[in-house]
Amino acid sequence: MSGAELIIQEINREAERKIEYILNEAREEAEKIKEEAKRRAESKAEWILRRAKTQAELEKQRIIANARLEVRRKRLAVQEEIIRNVLDEVRKRLQEMPEEEYFESIKALLKEAVEELKEGKVRVYSNERTLALISSRIEEIRDYLGSISIEIGSAISTMGGVIVETEDGRIRIDNTFEARMERFEGEIRAKIAKVLFGG
């Protein structure tokens, strides 16, 4: 074999070695890229999964919170309706109170107002039924109240009770059933709620 052929063979071998080296480098790089891509894909998949779980949990909490609010709203609506019905029944019973019981109630309301006004002469307003009852039993009321002069005022629109004012009309105590129920409605509601709903 001539010297030229030997040189050519050596060149070919060197070229093959270089090609093999380059191919190995390329394969390794490709493997690294594949591994990195796989790692990134897995990492992204985990992130997507975590985000989906977080969103699902948030949605679950939102649905539960909304459901609780809806239950509470419906419970309060039912509670309010029951309380309203009870208050309506109280009003109805006050209007239908037997006369003797009603008279005792009027005496107590008059006494409360007179004691608050601290006046020797007062004027009383109420509906026609109540004014007629007071007029027909005025002596009994005077005995009950003590040395108080009572003037019967004009009839007003009320389901019961009395308005009592000083002779000059400057101070007025509204002891009608409506006014008293309005004043004590919060307390009445709380009592009804406690009895019916335990709080």
Swiss-Prot record:
GO terms for cellular component: plasma membrane; proton-transporting two-sector ATPase complex, catalytic domain. One of its GO terms (molecular function) is proton-transporting ATPase activity, rotational mechanism. Gene3D superfamilies: ATP synthase, E subunit, C-terminal (3.30.2320.30), F1F0 ATP synthase subunit B, membrane domain (1.20.5.620). Its main location: membrane. The keyword RNA-binding does not apply. It is found in: Cell membrane. Keywords: ATP synthesis, Cell membrane, Hydrogen ion transport, Ion transport, Membrane, Transport. It is a peripheral membrane protein. One of its GO terms (biological process) is proton motive force-driven plasma membrane ATP synthesis. Has multiple subunits with at least A(3), B(3), C, D, E, F, H, I and proteolipid K(x). HAMAP family: ATP_synth_E_arch (MF_00311). Belongs to the V-ATPase E subunit family. This is A-type ATP synthase subunit E. It comes from Pyrococcus abyssi (strain GE5 / Orsay).
